[in-house]
Every structure is written in C-alpha cells, then in structure tokens.
Amino acid sequence: MKTFNIKSPDQAIRQALIDRIDNLAKPEGSLGMLEELALQIGLIQQTLSPRLRNPHNIIFAADHGIADEGVSFSPKEVTWQVINNFLGGGAGINFLCRQHGFELVLVDGGIDFDFPEGLDIIDRKVRKGTRNYLYEAALTGEEMEQAVTAGAEVVSDCHHRGCNVVSFGEMGVANTSTSSMWMSFLTGIDLKDCVGAGSGLDSEGVRHKYNILKQAKENYKGNGSTEDVITYFGGLEMLMAVGGMLQAAELGMLIIVDGFIMTNCLLAASQFYPEVCDYAVFGHCGDESGHARLLEYMKAKPLLNLGLRLGEGSGAVCSYPIIVSAVSMINEMHTFAQAAVTKYF
C-alpha cells in the first residue's frame, strides 16, 4: 500500500496553547470541548492563532457487489441516481455545504454507471463496483492500492487550492454492510453488534443482512491482517477515504469524521498509522446501531448527536460551526489582562 509520512503534532507548543486558553477571560475549562478543540487545532497547525481555510467536503462514491444479496433497502442504481442529485444541487449535503461554506467535491471511485462527459465529477473509477465478497474477494491488492492512492491525490489537490480542513462523505448502496465487516474484523466486536438498518431496513431485513454477512465472514479464508480485510471486503469509496484521511494527516490538515462508514475508514487508516487520529475531530454520533459502539471503542468524543444516518458527510459539515467557534475563541477572546478583569478562580 502507498506509504505516508505521518507524525503526531509536535508537543513543544502545547503548554503555550494551554496557557493561552486558560488565560482567556473566563473560568478555566468553562468552554469545555471548545477548549479541547482549540488545543487540538493549535497543535495540528503549530500556532497560537489557528485558522480554518477553504473547507472541502469530499464525497467518494462506488458500488458494492454484496448489494446483489439484498442487504440494502435500496437497489444498486440508487448510487448513480443520488450522484445526479448531488450534481443538480438538490441533495441534503448540497444545502449543508452551501450553508456552512464548504466546497463539495464529487469523486466516482467505482460506480456501476457511465456518466456523460462534462459533469462536475472527478473520474477515478477503479472498476464498476466491487465483486461480491460472499463468494470471492471484493478487490485485488492492486485495485485496493489504486483506490487508496486516488483518494490521497484528491486530497492533495484540495490542499493545493488552499484547503486546510476537510470532511469526507460517501455514497454507495450496501456500504454499511462493508463497514460492518471492517468493524467486526478490526475491533473483534461481534458481527451482530456491528450490523444495523443502514438506509432503512426493517427487523427482518436486518436479520437477512446479518445472515449474509455472517456467511461471508465464515467463507473468508484470508490471513486477517488489516490490509487483507479491507481488500477482501473492500469498498472503493471507503478505501479512497482511507487514503484521503492519511494524506490529509500527512499535510497537517484537520479531518472532520462523519458517521459510521467514515469512522470505519478512520479505524482502518489508524491500523496503519495510529497518528492519523491526532488530526481527526469526530463530527457526530449517527443513528446506525454500530456507530456508538465504534466511537466508544475508539475513545472518541463526537461533537453532535442528532440522530443522523444520511451519510454524505452531513454530520461532519453540521458540526463545523462548533469547530469555527473553538478557533474564534482562541483568536478573539480577550485575556484577563486585556479585559482588565481580575482572574477570579
């Protein structure tokens, strides 16, 4: 797999950041997670005056062979149909990006559809959907590497345009199934606790989904390494997000993590480079049943809990104003000395 140069942020500036935050005109710790965010972002950017520039939400999209087994509420063609809605500006993520000042980037990583030329979508299609991992490996090693590299290159392009904060979204019918497989293999959590309703399955649908994934897990004869798992049970859009997250960390960008699927992508990325988590903020806890368990496993503190299960980066983008508030706090609040206020604690 492509190699990255990721290091934890230098801690030499930590005490100066803490002193700056603690000397703002407020009781120490009274702004809670805003103070934690300001410290984290200051460490990432290595400055007492961090700035957020040109935020991007990148949506990687691809199809999944496992969708043929009826594990999703939606038929496979919904993937390309939703992309058309993104392109038309009428989807949930479109209004959120407009509201919060994000540039929306769409990437075809492996949709089983041929879009006409001239659309505002980046073509990095590795293949038209993955193979069905109930019966065979979803991807070859070469295809996995191609996807990771493509995701990294998309993020590099965003960085070159002045972006230093990025969120990731996805579109791909049945990708909650693939996420459940990653979660179970990479955490050791029982598969049953990793499988949920996805885009809207009823209890019978969830039972069928679990049985299919359980059989796929039993059929798997690989070595169980992270690289083997994310290849055999691969999702092209998910692997591109893995590469994108790792590249963002290498470039010192702030990563806003979305829901269940993107949290699994960070989990996979962290298996190779644990330091990637130092650059990540968890936007929200989604409504997919496995997400809360996964966040707990990763010792993550999500900023929001709104019952979202849309994907697309929606929860990450919704959380952005909180992140902006943290940066505004450290840059705009007066210290006790500036405010001529006695330090009262």
Curated annotation (Swiss-Prot):
One of its GO terms (molecular function) is nicotinate-nucleotide-dimethylbenzimidazole phosphoribosyltransferase activity. It comes from the Bacteria. Its EC number is 2.4.2.21. Disulfide bonds: none annotated. CDD domains: DMB-PRT_CobT (cd02439). Coiled coil: none annotated. It catalyses: 5,6-dimethylbenzimidazole + nicotinate beta-D-ribonucleotide = alpha-ribazole 5'-phosphate + nicotinate + H(+). Gene3D superfamilies: 1.10.1610.10, 3.40.50.10210. The active site is at E312. InterPro entries: Nict_dMeBzImd_PRibTrfase, Nict_dMeBzImd_PRibTrfase_bact, Nict_dMeBzImd_PRibTrfase_N, Nict_dMeBzImd_PRibTrfase_sf. One of its GO terms (biological process) is cobalamin biosynthetic process. Pathway: Nucleoside biosynthesis; alpha-ribazole biosynthesis; alpha-ribazole from 5,6-dimethylbenzimidazole: step 1/2. Keywords: Cobalamin biosynthesis, Glycosyltransferase, Transferase. PANTHER family: NICOTINATE-NUCLEOTIDE--DIMETHYLBENZIMIDAZOLE PHOSPHORIBOSYLTRANSFERASE (PTHR43463:SF1). Catalyzes the synthesis of alpha-ribazole-5'-phosphate from nicotinate mononucleotide (NAMN) and 5,6-dimethylbenzimidazole (DMB). Belongs to the CobT family. This is Nicotinate-nucleotide--dimethylbenzimidazole phosphoribosyltransferase. It comes from Porphyromonas gingivalis (strain ATCC 33277 / DSM 20709 / CIP 103683 / JCM 12257 / NCTC 11834 / 2561). The gene is cobT.
